[in-house]
Every structure is written in structure tokens, then in C-alpha cells.
Amino acid sequence: MAEVLLGVNIDHIATVRNARGTHYPDPVQAAFVAEQAGADGITIHLREDRRHITDRDVELLKKTIQTRMNLEMAVTDEMVDIACRIKPEFCCLVPEKRQEVTTEGGLDVIGQKDKVAAAVKRLSDAGILVSLFIDAEHRQIDAANEVGAPFIEIHTGAYADAKNEVEQEKEFHRIKAAATYAASKGLTVNAGHGLTYHNVQRIAALPEIYELNIGHAIIGRAVFSGLTAAVADMKTQMRKARR
């Protein structure tokens, strides 16, 4: 079985920096360290309120990342304009609410199909591979396929936040079924949100999963063990799942 890829989300390096309005820690340096430790790509979310990653970060990271940039963004004209100018390798369209602490759910592709389709077309025409961050629902997968996105990213938050084993098992099987269904439609399947060192292996073991995007758990561990070790440890957990 092919190795599952790891996209390291470095948003929270910027969160720490912005908490004091300093120039450090720098997400550009974090991306370099993560890549050296085995990250297959770097994920950043340029939010409309610029609460962590800034336009400056996006510009510099595009010039310095040695692997692949995955730019998460809302479905807005401003963000599509930025992406078409920067030209990251990947864009992941996500829902966004100003008052949320983190992304709370998947993108409702069905409810805004025309808007999403237009964004997908503009990004694709610019040579960018597009992913849609959606819940593990067949109807949303069908809609993602219909608007022309080649990738989806399954929202794993409900699985990660499950209160007990029964609930987690139910959510795992939803993700598993969604991954199988999406792959049968010809979509490439990524997953992410809330994954940790303790719950990542079951998701990484699913043969349809191409890449996992993980940030908070890695940055949290990095506080105590360093970013190099934190990224390497996550890669180890993911590799174990594919043995």
C-alpha cells in the first residue's frame, strides 16, 4: 500500500506570533523545519480576518516551500483572486465564520453549488488543484464531483471529538464509507481536522486516503519536544498504519 502523505498545518505558529504582535515565531521557518522533518506539504489557512496567517506569510511561503503549498480559504472573490495570483499547488475551499475558533463543519457544496463551481473553475484554470473540505456525506461528495473538484478533504472533526468509543466507531465508519464512495467516483481523498497522535492511525490505514492535513496536535507537541520531533513522530504513526 502506498504511503499516506502528511500535510503539516502551521497556522498556530502564526497564532503564537500574532498573540504578541511580534515577528517571531515565523511560519516560514516552521515550514522549513517541518519539511526537513518529513512533511510532504505545508498547509496554511488565510482567513478573511487574517487572525493567524497573513498575506505576507502566503507570499513568502510560496517562494520558500520546497514541497507543496496547500492554501485553505473561503469561497470569496478576494480569496480566489489571491490564490490565482500566488498560484499554490493546492487550494482547499472551506467554510468560514468570523466568530468560530476553528472550522466547525464541512463546506455546504449543495447549498452554494454555482458559487463553488465558479471558484473551482477559476482556480483550475490558473493551474491549481482544488479540494473541497466536506463532511462525510454522499450527497456532498456527489456535489463536489459535479462542480469539478478533483480532490475532497473529509472533515474528521466528529470522529476526533467523539465522547466515547461507540460514537467514535460510528464516525469512523461514516468516514470509511465516504472515502470508499468518493474514490469510486474518481475523486482523490484527503482527510483532516482534529486528528492527533492517538486517533490518526485508523484514518491513515484507510487505503483510499491520499493525504492527511494535521496541525494543532503537531504544534502542541512541538511546544514540549520540538517541531522536528513532533512532525517525525506523526509520520511514524501514519507509516505504522500502512504496514
Swiss-Prot record:
One of its GO terms (cellular component) is cytosol. Pathway: Cofactor biosynthesis; pyridoxine 5'-phosphate biosynthesis; pyridoxine 5'-phosphate from D-erythrose 4-phosphate: step 5/5. One of its GO terms (biological process) is pyridoxine biosynthetic process. One of its GO terms (molecular function) is pyridoxine 5'-phosphate synthase activity. 3-amino-2-oxopropyl phosphate binds at N9, R20, G194, G215, H216. PANTHER family: PYRIDOXINE 5'-PHOSPHATE SYNTHASE (PTHR30456:SF0). Belongs to the PNP synthase family. HAMAP family: PdxJ. Catalyzes the complicated ring closure reaction between the two acyclic compounds 1-deoxy-D-xylulose-5-phosphate (DXP) and 3-amino-2-oxopropyl phosphate (1-amino-acetone-3-phosphate or AAP) to form pyridoxine 5'-phosphate (PNP) and inorganic phosphate. This is Pyridoxine 5'-phosphate synthase. It comes from Photorhabdus laumondii subsp. laumondii (strain DSM 15139 / CIP 105565 / TT01).
